[in-house]
Structures are given as C-alpha cells and as structure tokens.
C-alpha cells in the first residue's frame, strides 16, 4: 500500500480524485452453518459482494477493495448476539485488539447468519472511517440475492463515511437510493446527491487519512472483475 503511494509523483498524489477503502470481511460461524459448511460458496458470495460494493462506490470517487477474508469455521471470536449494540461494540473491540495487529486495513465488516433483533439488518458507527475501533459495521445476511447483501454492506460503510439516511429531498436519478432508511424490494446501486455531499463533507472536515493511499494489487484478494482496472492490477 505505501509502496504504491510512493511510486506516484507528488502531482499524481495531489490530483488523484479517488479514495481507497481496504476492507476485511469477517464471516461468523452462523454463516458457515447456514451454508452447510460450503466455504467455496461463502467465499464466492463475499467476493461478489466486494466487487458490487466497489461498483457502487465508483460514482462517489471511491474504490472499495477486499484485502482480507476471515471465516470463523470452528467458533466465533466474539459472542454474536441479536442485540446489535452489543455485537457492534464487541466486534469493534475485537477488531481494534486483534485484527489490526494481524492485517493492515481501513475498515472491517462482520457478516452474520443470525437474525438481529427487530427489523434491523445492518448497523454501524457514523463518521468513524479510519478509527482504530469504530471503523466497522455488522450485517445480517438475510437475503439469497447477492446484490442485497452488497447494498446493505455499502449502506453501513456509508455510515462509517459520515453519511446519514436519505430524506425526501434526496434523489439518485429516480431509483431507490442506497442510503434510504429501509432497503427497497429492488435495491439500487446508486448513492443520492445528499450522500455524495455528506461523504465529502466528512472527508474534508475530518481528513480520514487511511483511505488516501492506493493499495498494491498484491494486497487485493477478491478475484478480478471485468472492466475494473484496480481489481485486475
């Protein structure tokens, strides 16, 4: 990651419009049970989610790349509960204490097969990108549709990037928007005008430096996706 940054001239570093989120996906034991121990199926689902997230964030001038995939095949490293406040805090503490020491990354997402309490399907801290503890989200894998999982993950990462839920004045070309307060039956791949403004306001005001540097191609573990030069590097 640092080498890739060093290989660019100062002018390239200044004028590169993109931010880069290096993400680790963590899959819990309930997911392993849900997919009958089929780790290849789980990996493929996670790779597709990462690639879909990257496509969604391109319009925000972001690249989202998977630099780590951890599957808790034997036992969970934290207690995953339906209580989202408890689980989010537990995952954040584990990320700060253990995961950061094992793998350099900017953001971590826990994907679980348990059913969160109430109607919640995702939960994250707001405005926390690059924080050593709070740059995390938790996601319930409730739908068999791969795109739905990616939309929820993009939504929760959006909260990490300082984006709040859309209101009636936000739009994204007539489609349902990613940061809507609830997921639509036909989930969209687009962020709203409000999301764009809030995200870049957060970046300008808080300067989360961990997303400034372009990762090395060798750090990216998700398979190439046609038309995406970063993933094919």
UniProtKB/Swiss-Prot annotation:
Cofactor(s) in the UniProt record: Zn(2+)
Sites where a glycan is attached: 193
Annotated residues for binding of Zn(2+): 155, 159, 165
pH dependence: Optimum pH is 7.0-10.5.
Catalytic center residues: 156
A biological-process GO annotation: proteolysis
Superkingdom: Eukaryota
Protein's name according to its UniProt entry: Zinc metalloproteinase recombinant fibrinogenase II
Organism of derivation: Deinagkistrodon acutus
